[in-house]
Amino acid sequence: MMSANSLMDYENDPEVLEKLYRNQPEKFELELSYALKQKPDSITFRIWATRLNIELSQKDDISPTLITVIGISILAGLTTRIPALFFREDWFYPRFAPFVALMAIASYFLIKNNNGYLTRLVVIFCLITICYLSLLPDWSTSSSITMLLIHLPLACWLITGIVFSNGRWQEKESRIRFIRYSGELVILSGLILIGGFGLTALTIGLFQVIGIELDDKFIETVLALGVPAIPVIGTYVYDVVLQKKIQLAATLAKIFAPLFLVLVVAFILATTVQGIPFLDDRDYLIIFNALLIVILCIALFSIVGQDQSKETFIQRCIIISLIAATVFIDLIALYAISLRLLEFGFSINRFYIWTINILILGNLIYLLVAFAYSIQNNQRTSGMIDAVTNYLPIYALWVALATFILPLVFQFQ
């Protein structure tokens, strides 16, 4: 099947491009327009565009202006803060604060891409989700609803990914770009958050000097208005200010990958000597699984963030060693959770955690197999990148089940 990736793969093969055009001329023109957005300086694509009279300017890919971003940020903050004045904060914020923040990012890309179909899709998703969240029982006494609220931001993030890719979520390159953007956004948002806390603390201190005390309501209002706006501002910084040319996530992943490898190997050696004393400790298992997810993210960003033409043998060894060691840790976690299931019986929390560990284990094994295949066929890490992008639909399916289906199956218990 022809795609923009096909055109980019055969950019330097004029015979294949001519064959693709003759077989599907309308599809070729559509994909050529998208390929031009990805590689606007490509001489080959510009020649084809001239031949087919395709507009070279990218007027349909204009990023939202700063005024628009400020408007989205203010609207997100007000949408988060004003309803909280009429509802209990412990009821409203866990349900709607992450939802509003992530849908604000989706709004940014809807404005950028100007896609009517995706706009309708997001509006329908928002209406259904708002009704769904509004009708949920109290989350503090329900394990399934607690897990729902944990997975809901991931569901919103998947919708954002579809909007980010302008509906081309099935293409590998779109998924890679979204993963890279996600890593950069987390880091940029963290930096903006730190700066915001510093500015707030400085404001409070300066007013205290002149005898004016800013109470807790001021801090709550600043947080409620400011925090939901941070991801949108971070997106604007990445997309417009930095022109997508930053690689903080990949750089940090390269720095921390060997450090976490040392940590994991040391842990494996320690458990070999000392045994596994935390099997019956729930808090330790939670920390253990959090560490597992962090290591997986480092491995994934190390894979998708690096330039394959510049990767070294040592980098490849570090990545594969980290993945292999993480498989061992995941097996320990699964063993511990399985013991708790056998000893204490079935519970919703144990089921969710056990399933998540199974999914992560499957992803890690897939990466190992892809690495072995790439070594055998001398393909560098391209096979591992495919393993990363091809596994995303499995995570998406689980997130959809955990958010919208399983709570109903468990009757919100």
Q: Predicted segment positions?
A:
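Membrane-interface helix-loop-helix junctions at boundaries between adjacent transmembrane segments
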Residues: 89-94, 105-227, 235-253
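Alpha-helical transmembrane segments
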Residues: 64-81, 121-131, 394-400
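Membrane-embedded alpha-helical segments in integral membrane proteins
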Residues: 72-85, 129-137, 200-210, 265-274, ...
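Transmembrane alpha-helix entry/boundary detector in multi-pass membrane proteins
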Residues: 92-93, 219-223, 252-256, 274-292, ...
